[in-house]
């Protein structure tokens, strides 16, 4: 199907040539006149953008498609006069979510890359080469480059968050989202991510007091120590990635239910969920990671003042951190510097918290479930019932034996009688004791009703009351209908005698008037016959 240009306005395709009466049609969304066609082909209009399909294929040329995509992007950036629809906003919000997730992943990758390179450079500069070497300078430049990229990714991440805020709240100005709290958090995050060992060799004098001898010690330390240890604060990016990749956070149904119940999906909620699902794994990973990081930090802090290489050795540092984490404190190893003491202090606090969590987790694992509690209580009740029955049977048996050896024999054996009397008293005391134990067991079972069971009983009672109320309302409706029917039946019964009398004794015909008499007089054929009186009167 091809289009041909003519001088007139008849036969022109849509959008080609001048319009009717010499004016050009204007695109309502783009705000510019439609472009005329430049060759044969079918032109289609979608969303105000002309797209030509050539006869040789179902699509246009790649260059034309790229130009059209660029024009659409420019229009999306400049914005049209029409407000965005709900579907457009939802699609834009979903795209922003995906971009934010990718930016968080890239930020974690570059942050971990900087930490790994920092640890490598610190270890190599201590045992292989010096800080003045070219390898150290190259590794520090690599750390600086990864830090710059990380800062850019953090800025882009917060820019996407601001865009999400604007989309969610329907705002137009990004400065509305820039509250003091958000600005402070962004500034703090940028400062944390910006700390890294800069290229070059810088030293300072580090003074400390040795642990056992209390002798002051001074050493020339590298400034990289103070700039390398804070780089572990970048591990907060791991919590952000866990939040954005959590199935609870990405599931739309979960977020909807959380929004209805006023639950905020943040890192704290995800951590609680993980502690509920797999508490042992979470505690193990956290403890081992903290152990390794703290041991390496103590090693770096103590290497300049530990002449005997006790705590500056990695295995020795791990031993010091482990006994501090478990709150044992043998005292065979102690840190010398305030840096090492601070790390040990934080390790002790984390160890106390993790120990409490371990105790709570183990106690919860060892606790019986509701079904297991019911089974255990039933078994104990059954055993107590059997023991009470056996004690009662022993009482009856000893009573019979006492009667037998005292009344049914000619010469009673007093020793045997006393023996059975002793057993009789023991059986009575045992039966009384078992009965008291059973009563106490019943009290414990009554007290074992948890709030969940009470709530369940309350819901069952509410359902029963609701059902009774519905039945009562239905019964009242039936009684009202029955009363109306009884009223109708009573009215019918009251009218029944009159209807019966009317049916048995019909009314006499009306007496003839004067006109009828004259007619009867003049009419020779009419004869009036008197009627006989009847019993009905």
Swiss-Prot record:
A Pfam family of the record is: Ion_trans_2
Q: Which ranges does the record mark as transmembrane?
A: 108-128, 137-157, 176-196, 225-245, 274-294
Give the UniProt tissue specificity note: Highest expression in brain and liver with lower levels in heart, testis, kidney and colon. In colon, detected in smooth muscle cells. Expressed in atrial and ventricular myocytes with higher levels in atrial myocytes.
**Ranges of Acidic residues composition bias in the record:** 65-76
Q: Which UniProt keywords apply?
A: Calmodulin-binding, Cytoplasm, Ion channel, Ion transport, Membrane, Transmembrane, Transmembrane helix, Transport
User: What is the disulfide pattern of this chain?
Assistant: none
Biased composition regions of type Polar residues, renumbered to the chain: 1-10
Q: What broad class describes the main subcellular location of this protein?
A: membrane
Matching Gene3D superfamilies = 1.10.287.70
- What SMART domains would the database entry show? CaMBD
The annotated region (Calmodulin-binding) lies at 381-460
Reactions listed under catalytic activity:
K(+)(in) = K(+)(out)
Q: Name the domain of life this protein comes from.
A: Eukaryota
One Gene Ontology term, aspect cellular component: plasma membrane
What intramembrane ranges does the Swiss-Prot or TrEMBL entry report? Answer: 314-334
Which region is the signal sequence?
A: none
Q: What compartments host this protein?
A: Membrane; Cytoplasm, Myofibril, Sarcomere, Z line
| Membrane topology listed for this record | Multi-pass membrane protein
Family indicated by similarity? Belongs to the potassium channel KCNN family. KCa2.1/KCNN1 subfamily.
Record-linked PANTHER family? SMALL CONDUCTANCE CALCIUM-ACTIVATED POTASSIUM CHANNEL
Domain remarks in the Swiss-Prot or TrEMBL record: The coiled-coil domaim mediates heteromeic assembly.
What is the official name of this protein in its record? Answer: Small conductance calcium-activated potassium channel protein 1
Organism in which the protein naturally occurs: Mus musculus (Mouse)
């Amino acid at each position: 199907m091809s289009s041909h240009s003519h001088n007139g306005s008849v036969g022109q395709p849509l959008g080609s040539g001048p319009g009717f009466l010499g004016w050009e049609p204007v695109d309502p969304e783009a705000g510019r006149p439609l472009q005329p066609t430049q060759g044969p082909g079918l032109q289609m209009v979608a969303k105000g953008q002309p797209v030509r399909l050539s006869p040789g294929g179902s699509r246009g040329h790649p260059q034309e498609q790229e130009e059209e995509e660029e024009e659409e992007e420019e229009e999306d950036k400049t914005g049209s006069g029409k407000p965005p629809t709900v579907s457009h906003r939802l699609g834009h919000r979903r795209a922003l979510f995906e971009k934010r997730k990718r930016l968080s992943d890239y930020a974690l990758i570059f942050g971990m890359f900087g930490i790994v390179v920092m640890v490598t450079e610190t270890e190599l500069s201590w045992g292989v080469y010096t800080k003045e070497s070219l390898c150290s300078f190259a590794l520090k430049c690599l750390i600086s480059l990864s830090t710059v990229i990380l800062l850019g990714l953090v800025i882009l991440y917060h820019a996407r968050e601001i865009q999400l805020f604007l989309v969610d709240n329907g705002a137009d100005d990004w400065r509305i989202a820039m509250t003091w709290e958000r600005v402070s958090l962004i500034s703090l995050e940028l400062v944390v991510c910006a700390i890294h060992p800069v290229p070059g060799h810088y030293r300072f004098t580090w003074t400390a007091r040795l642990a056992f001898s209390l002798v002051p010690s001074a050493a020339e330390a590298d400034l990289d120590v103070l700039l390398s240890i804070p780089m572990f604060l970048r591990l907060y990016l791991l919590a952000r990635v866990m939040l954005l990749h959590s199935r609870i956070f990405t599931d739309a149904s979960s977020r909807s239910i959380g929004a209805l119940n006023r639950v905020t999906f943040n890192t704290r909620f995800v951590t609680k969920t993980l502690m509920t699902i797999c508490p042992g794994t979470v505690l193990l990973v956290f403890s081992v990671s903290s152990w390794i990081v703290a041991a390496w930090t103590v090693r770096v802090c103590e290497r300049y003042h530990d002449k005997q290489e006790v705590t500056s050795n990695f295995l020795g540092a791990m031993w010091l951190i482990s006994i501090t984490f478990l709150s044992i404190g043998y005292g065979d190893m102690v840190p010398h510097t305030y840096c090492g003491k601070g790390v040990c202090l934080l390790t002790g606090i984390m160890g106390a918290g993790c120990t409490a969590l371990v105790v709570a987790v183990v106690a919860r694992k060892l606790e019986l479930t509701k079904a297991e509690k019911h089974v255990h209580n039933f078994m104990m009740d059954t055993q107590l019932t059997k023991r009470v029955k056996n004690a009662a049977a022993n009482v009856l048996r000893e009573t019979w034996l006492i009667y037998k050896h005292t009344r049914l024999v000619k010469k009673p054996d007093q020793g045997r009688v006393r023996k059975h009397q002793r057993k009789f008293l023991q059986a009575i005391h045992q039966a009384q004791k078992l009965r008291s134990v059973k009563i106490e067991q019943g009290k414990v079972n009554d007290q074992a009703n948890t709030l969940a069971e009470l709530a369940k009983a309350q819901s069952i009672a509410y359902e029963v009351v609701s059902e009774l109320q519905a039945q009562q309302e239905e019964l009242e409706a039936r009684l009202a209908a029955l009363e109306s029917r009884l009223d109708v039946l009573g009215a019918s019964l009251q009218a029944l005698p009159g209807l019966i009398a009317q049916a048995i004794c019909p009314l006499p015909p009306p007496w003839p008037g004067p006109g009828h008499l004259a007619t009867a007089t003049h009419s020779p054929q009419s004869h009036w016959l008197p009627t006989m009186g009847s019993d009905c009167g």
